[in-house]
Regions:
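Transmembrane beta-strand segments of Gram-negative outer membrane beta-barrel proteins
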Residues: 1-5
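Active-site regions of oxyanion-processing enzymes, predominantly non-cytosolic
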Residues: 206-209
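Acidic/aromatic-lined carbohydrate-recognition and catalytic surfaces
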Residues: 7-191, 202
Length: 209
């Protein structure tokens, strides 16, 4: 006995004929778009249910590039740096991907960041270090020779991690990096709801989001 249904087939642009063939072969009752792609009109016309991925907090660079202080943030920890004198420089971005992360230079670093003497475990008083925002380096001026130091600092996420993975894995070349945004911020939250509402109106062919 042959039955159909309960199977969703992923598809993407320029894949209409093979999608039709596989849908018939495997008895698919629904088709969804692959991440970062759109379905061809020929696929939409197959008469299957359409599942569509919608990303409420990315893929709108026209908005977030005007509000770059409203991207998500993370705390990062630098590598340990050995002080060879009473001053030591700790580079913030060594080991981090600069296309994905950017130090938050907007908020007061002495309020939100932390420099730690890893040899003693003590937090260095904020008066004992300064940030060079041009070099993304913390200058520790109250160091103890032969002690190791780290910096915990806030950074903006400027490339959505999932989209970055797909971009690099699929070799999307010069496709614009999608910048994520944080709906904690009222203006961005309103933008997210407004654009989703408009997307629903513009996507009557979609059965399941």
């Amino acid at each position: 006995m042959t039955s159909t249904g309960r199977f969703t087939l992923p598809s993407e642009e320029n894949f209409a004929e093979k999608t039709k063939e596989l849908a018939e072969l495997w008895g698919a009752d629904a088709i969804r778009n692959s991440d970062g792609t759109h379905l061809d009109e020929a696929v939409l016309a197959l008469g299957k249910k359409i599942y569509s991925a919608y990303f409420p907090t990315r893929a709108h660079n026209e908005w977030i590039t005007l509000h770059m202080d409203e991207t998500p943030q993370v705390y990062l920890l630098t590598a340990r740096i050995l002080a060879e004198s009473n001053a030591v420089d700790v580079p913030l971005m060594d080991g981090f991907f600069e296309e994905q992360l950017k130090p938050n230079r907007d908020a007061d670093p002495h309020k939100y960041w932390e420099v730690v003497d890893r040899t003693t475990g003590e937090v260095v008083d904020p008066s004992g270090w300064t940030l060079d925002p041009g070099e993304d380096t913390v200058h520790v001026t109250a160091a103890v020779p032969l002690h190791e130091y780290t910096v915990s600092f806030l950074a903006y996420i400027i490339w959505d991690p999932v989209e970055m993975y797909n971009h690099l894995t699929n070799d999307w070349g010069d496709k614009e990096h999608e910048i994520p945004f944080d709906i904690y911020h009222p203006a961005t939250r309103k933008f997210v709801f407004d654009t989703f509402d408009q997307w629903l109106k513009d996507s009557p062919q979609v059965d399941v989001v």
